[in-house]
Each structure stands twice: as C-alpha cells, then as structure tokens.
Regions:
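An alpha-helical appendage that flanks or caps ligand/catalytic pockets
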Residues: 8-134, 167-192
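Glycine-rich, proline-tolerant flexible connector loops at the mouths of alpha/beta enzymes
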Residues: 5, 139-151
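Short coil/turn segments at secondary-structure junctions
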Residues: 1, 108-112, 142, 146
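Short glycine/threonine-rich loop-to-helix capping motif typified by GTGT followed
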Residues: 43-47, 146-157, 188-189
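A cross-family glycoside hydrolase active-site/sugar-binding cleft signature
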Residues: 2-4, 34-36, 138-140
Length: 192
C-alpha cells in the first residue's frame, strides 16, 4: 500500500511492486495494492472545499520540524532508501513524492486531496482508480479542526453515495497496464 504519495509517484512505486513481484515469481495484481488519500464529502463542493483546507494541518503543524524527526535514521532499510532516491523528481514530486511544499489547490489539482459533493468525489476517485487500479482505497477522512458533525456527514455520504458508485469501476489486471517507461510523468493539474 502507498501511504499518501502523489499519484505520479504511486504509479512509479506500483511499477516497482510489479517488477519485484515478477522477479520473485509472484503475479502482481490489484488485490495486493492499495492507496491512501485525503478525502472529504459535503453536500456542496463549496462547503467541502472550505472544510478540506483542514487537511493542510499536518503539513503546516506536525511536519514543520527537522526532517530527521519525521523520518529518523533506522526507520527504513538501505534498500528502501535506494528506491526512494530513484523516485520521480520535479514539481509534481514535491518532497519525495508526498506533496510537501504544494498548496492546497495544487494537491486538489493532482487528486492527492479529494473534496466535493458526492458526484465530484465519485468522479475524482474514479480518476484515481482508473489510473492506479488499486484493490484498496483507504480514506484519511478528517484532520485539524474539522467538526464532528461535518465529519460524520462525510462518512455518511461516502457510505451511501460514493462507495456504491465506485463498486461499478472495473479494476484492470496489472499485466494490461502500460509500463512506467512508456508513461510520461508531468505536472498535470498544477498551477505554474
């Protein structure tokens, strides 16, 4: 599972998973790959966009300290660090592919934060599913000062409207997907 990296980076990491599985004699597939993203649903896009700004709390508060406090030595194997060093770079990668340094609107633009009414959220999550084909989508649904009432309404809308619609989106086997060396990574959705 990929924990909150940008979709471009996740696409690259998924290919690492596919290649590693193949090298080890396993068949990679959606049933063994998931994606975590921030998502909030409200009755209107405007309300969700406003409440969704609270997703920036972690970046603005908890992750402000020295990097070694967030990712101390020894938390990752040397092999993991080598893989991280190969990640795509550039504007869209933002701090190793996690989007640190990108604005709220930029993170929304690349579907790292998905907010809106049920139709908007369904459309945006469908885009992520069609691109990554994850067997699991994990939703980080509240942060900062989001109110309990609004968070419970988001959960209700996800459960009653969004998730049932997503069950209609087919997952493609990974051997039907283009290899990363044939996919161009870019800054789609990012403001200059």
């Amino acid at each position: 599972m990929n924990l909150g990296a940008l979709v471009d980076t996740t696409e690259w990491l998924k290919q690492v998973y596919i290649d590693t599985a193949e090298e080890e004699g396993w068949k990679a597939g959606p049933e063994h790959f998931g994606y975590l993203l921030r998502c909030f649903v409200a009755d209107t896009d405007e309300k969700a966009i406003e409440l969704g700004k609270e997703f920036m709390w972690t970046i603005e508060h908890r992750q402000r300290g020295p990097m070694e406090h967030n990712d101390p030595p020894g938390y990752q194997s040397r092999a993991s660090v080598e893989i991280k060093a190969q990640r795509p770079t550039g504007n869209v990668a933002g701090a190793g592919g996690l989007g640190v340094g990108l604005s709220y609107d930029q993170l929304r633009g690349v579907n790292n934060i998905i907010v809106g009414n049920p139709d908007t959220v369904t459309q945006k999550l469908t885009e992520v599913i069609e691109r990554l084909s994850p067997g699991y989508i994990h939703i980080y649904g509240n942060e900062g000062a989001m109110g309990h009432k609004e968070t419970m309404r988001s959960i209700e809308l996800l459960g009653k409207e969004v998730i049932p619609a997503l069950h209609e989106v087919p997952l493609r086997p990974y051997d039907d997907r283009p290899r990363m060396d044939t996919i161009s990574s870019g800054t789609a959705g990012l403001a200059p």
